[in-house]
Amino acid sequence: MLDVAEMFVSINGEGTLAGQLAVFVRFSGCNLCCSYCDTMWANQSDTPCRTMTAEEIYNEICKMGIRNVTLTGGEPLNRNDIFELMELLAKDSRLYVEIETNGSIPLKPFLSIKNRPSMTMDYKLPSSGMEHSMYTENLNLLDSRDTVKFVSGSIGDLERAKEIINEYKLIDRCEVYLSPVFGKIEPSTIVEYMKQNQMNGVTLQLQMHKIIWNPNAKGV
């Protein structure tokens, strides 16, 4: 069984499909506690949830008629029945499935799924307070279907992101995004850093949904 905090249709606010419609399935609970977390409400023990089977979630997704599906959280890979749901979704050729994961869960077991979802993996930078939890071996397993996202709140974070990008040769491996911690660093500061360091192949990403709606809004 899986605890679903919310399920809704909106636009993808970030990533390679930014601006496209997607079904979002947000699971409750996370094994990390990042300083800038914008979905802390979904990680509380008393968060109202729907407890659903993998098949129930799949059927509800199908009824919505939207091709893109994003599994998010919380931390979706830290759920007992998530493998079953991933297999159900992967068998449906009508769907394009993306999983947002926090970088602390080993990805290898999930990468064996035939027609597996794409992985958007956070690498938690120093200002998150969670860099010590990163499972760095994941960075060697990603391919062109996948993305690594660095959410940066300071120049120090950007320096660390550059180190990781270079150490693991991420530009040659997968998509790479730099994103500002909302309200902590100006996007223009990130652009200047990218220019000064000739960060070819890196994409600046802004959270589109926070521009369109209230940054604290749920279900958007």
Predicted regions and their residues:
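Short aromatic/hydrophobic contact patches that present stacked aromatics
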Residues: 24, 70, 147-149
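Flexible, acidic/Gly-rich N-terminal and inter-domain linker regions that tether
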Residues: 1-28, 32-36, 40-41, 197-203, ...
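Short N-terminal micro-motifs specific to bacterial/archaeal maturation
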Residues: 21, 28, 48, 149-152, ...
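Short hydrophobic/aromatic-rich motifs at helix boundaries and adjacent loops
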Residues: 28-31, 57-58, 133-134, 163
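A generic, residue-level signal for flexible/boundary positions that often mark functional hotspots
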Residues: 5, 11, 46, 133-136
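Conserved Radical SAM active-site core
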Residues: 2, 9, 21-22, 33-117
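Conserved AdoMet/S-adenosylmethionine-binding subsite of the radical SAM
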Residues: 77-220
